[in-house]
Amino acid sequence: MPSPPYTLERTVVIQATPATVFGFLTDTPLWAAWWGAGSEIDARPGGQMKICYPGGTEAVGEVIEVTPPERLVFTYGYASGKMIPPGGSRVTIELEPLGAATRLRLTHELDNEPVREDHIQGWRYQLSLFANVVADAVNSGASGVVDAWYDAWADTDAASRQRTLSRLAAPALRFRDRYSNTDGIDDLVAHIAGAQRFMPGIRMQRRGEVRHCQGTVLADFVARSSDGQDRASGTTTREPRIAARVAAYSAHQYARATGWR
C-alpha cells in the first residue's frame, strides 16, 4: 500500500530483551495477553492479525513484514469499516536494544489527521499496557528474589551473605535509605554487618504481594524484632536488569522508620 500522509509515533522502554518483547508481538497467546481474548496473529508475510477490543470492536489487518527480533509491520483497520477500513492504515513496530532493556518505537500511518488524533490516546494506553504485560512475565519470579534479598539481611555469615547478594544483585548495586548510602555489593555486605551489630534480632519480611509497574518492582516490608514486635516498615523498589544467569537487581530501598528500639 502507498504511504498514508499522516503519521503517529510513540515510544516506550520495556525492561526485557528484544527477543522477549518480539515474542509478545508474534506469538498468538502472548499477543492475546496484550490485546485480549480472541486476538490472534499469524506472524508471517501475508498472515492475518485480529485484535478484539472490549465492547465487541474488532481490528483486522495483514502482516507485511516480520524481521525477528527487530521489526513487525502490518495493516490496520476496523472490521466494521468505520473510521479506518480494513487495510486503510499501516503500523510499524521497531525494537532497539537499550542496555538490558528494549526501546519500542511504534509508527502508525493514517489517511487523515482527525483519525490520527483519535488514535494518540489509544496507543499511549496500549503501549503502557503492553510494557506491563511483558513485565508480568519477566518478573514472574520476583517474589522469590525479594524474599531472598530480605533473608540476606538476617544472614550472620558474611561469606554466605556475599554469595546471596552477588546472585541477586548487579555488581554496581546502589542502596539508599534514611540510614545508609552504599555503592557495590562489598559495601552493602559491610553495612548489613553493622545493622546486625547495632540492631540485633531485627528481621525484614515481605508484607503482601510484590507489585510492579513497567519493570520497577515494589515490595512492602516490615522489620520485626525477635519478640515479634514490628519496629519499622517501608517499601523496597528495584529496577530489574536482565542477566543470563538470573534477573539482576539494582536496588534502591526507601525505609520509613517507625521507631527502632
Say what each PLM segment does:
Residues 21-22, 31, 49, 63, ...:
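Hydrophobic pocket/interface hotspot
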Residues 81-133, 190-261:
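A beta-strand edge to alpha-helix "cap/lid" segment located at domain peripheries
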